[in-house]
């Protein structure tokens, strides 16, 4: 299995995760009437985003456009500084991508969270409140879906 075949598999996997997240919000939530499903959708969106960022970093490193580091946070910083714009992510999109990563981290670290009115409320260790709404998660899905499409068009078209 070559590099581009593996890339295609990761793009497809990312797309499936986004579809799962969207299905959770649009289909499962109205039936189950449980806003905690938004947190599950956020996890799917974060996994999809992380897969795409990893793929972009590997591809850009292979093309010798960037340098990779052993530190994951440094590599994510490289993505935002040198790669995101190349893949069609403007300042607002990059802000949303960072928010996905931030909220996902807060969700994982949170000792206390609850759902109310189709929103998930997360309390962090510093007693700050973070809210994820249905509308917000759909916005996240849209941004990551756009990144997925741009990766598909950029990385996989370069093969031909």
Roles of regions detected by a PLM:
Residues 155-160:
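Short acidic DE-rich linear segments
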Residues 7, 14, 38-41, 97, ...:
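Hydrophobic packing residues in well-ordered alpha-helices of helical domains and bundles
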Residues 23, 29-63:
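N-terminal interaction modules that seed assembly of large macromolecular complexes
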Residues 62-149:
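Long, charged low-complexity segments
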Residues 13-24, 44, 51, 143, ...:
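Amphipathic, well-ordered alpha-helical segments in soluble domains
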């Amino acid at each position: 299995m070559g590099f581009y075949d593996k890339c295609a598999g990761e793009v497809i996997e990312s797309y499936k995760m986004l579809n799962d997240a969207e299905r959770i919000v649009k289909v499962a939530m109205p039936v189950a009437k449980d806003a905690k499903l938004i947190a599950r959708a956020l996890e799917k969106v974060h996994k999809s985003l992380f897969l795409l960022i990893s793929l972009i970093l590997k591809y850009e490193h292979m093309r010798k456009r960037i340098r990779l580091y052993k530190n994951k946070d440094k590599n994510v910083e490289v993505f935002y500084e040198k790669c995101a714009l190349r893949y069609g992510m403007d300042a607002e999109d990059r802000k949303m991508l960072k928010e996905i990563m931030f909220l996902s981290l807060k969700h994982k670290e949170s000792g206390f969270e609850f759902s109310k009115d189709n929103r998930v409320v997360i309390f962090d260790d510093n007693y700050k409140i973070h809210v994820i709404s249905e509308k917000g998660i759909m916005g996240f899905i849209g941004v990551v879906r756009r990144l997925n499409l741009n990766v598909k068009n950029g990385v996989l078209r370069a093969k031909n």
